């Protein structure tokens, strides 16, 4: 299992817009073959900080995810909402 944890920080006045932009990515991602989990989390202490927990069957399904229209649209729209680049950490999923 291929797991990615992504931290995304957005401008405080863009939180609602971020949630709507990412909702579309979430809805598309959970329908993908090979997607095991796609959670969007909001930091309770920093309202404008989000974490995305993505679990995919393998690297091929991750590669496919990055070709989908919902992913590409989301990434393009995120640029103006973020305070800096996304931070990604990769993990090997052992016990889902």
From Swiss-Prot:
Matches recorded under PANTHER family: (4S)-4-HYDROXY-5-PHOSPHONOOXYPENTANE-2,3-DIONE ISOMERASE, QUINOL MONOOXYGENASE YGIN-RELATED
Any one GO MF annotation of this record: (4S)-4-hydroxy-5-phosphonooxypentane-2,3-dione isomerase activity
Function recorded in the entry: Involved in the degradation of phospho-AI-2, thereby terminating induction of the lsr operon and closing the AI-2 signaling cycle. Catalyzes the conversion of (4S)-4-hydroxy-5-phosphonooxypentane-2,3-dione (P-DPD) to 3-hydroxy-5-phosphonooxypentane-2,4-dione (P-HPD).
HAMAP family on file: LsrG
GO cellular component, one term: cytosol
Protein name, UniProt field: (4S)-4-hydroxy-5-phosphonooxypentane-2,3-dione isomerase
Positions of the ABM domain: 2-91
Entry keywords, A to Z: Cytoplasm, Isomerase
């Amino acid at each position: 299992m291929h797991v990615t944890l992504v931290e995304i920080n957005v401008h405080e006045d863009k939180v609602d817009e971020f949630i709507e932009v990412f909702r579309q990515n979430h809805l598309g991602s959970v329908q993908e073959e090979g997607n095991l989990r796609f959670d969007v989390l909001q930091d309770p202490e920093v309202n404008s900080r989000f974490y995305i927990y993505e679990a995919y069957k393998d690297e091929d399904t991750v590669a496919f995810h990055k070709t989908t229209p919902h992913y590409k649209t989301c990434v393009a729209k995120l640029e103006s909402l973020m305070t800096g680049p996304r931070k990604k950490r990769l993990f090997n999923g052992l016990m889902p």
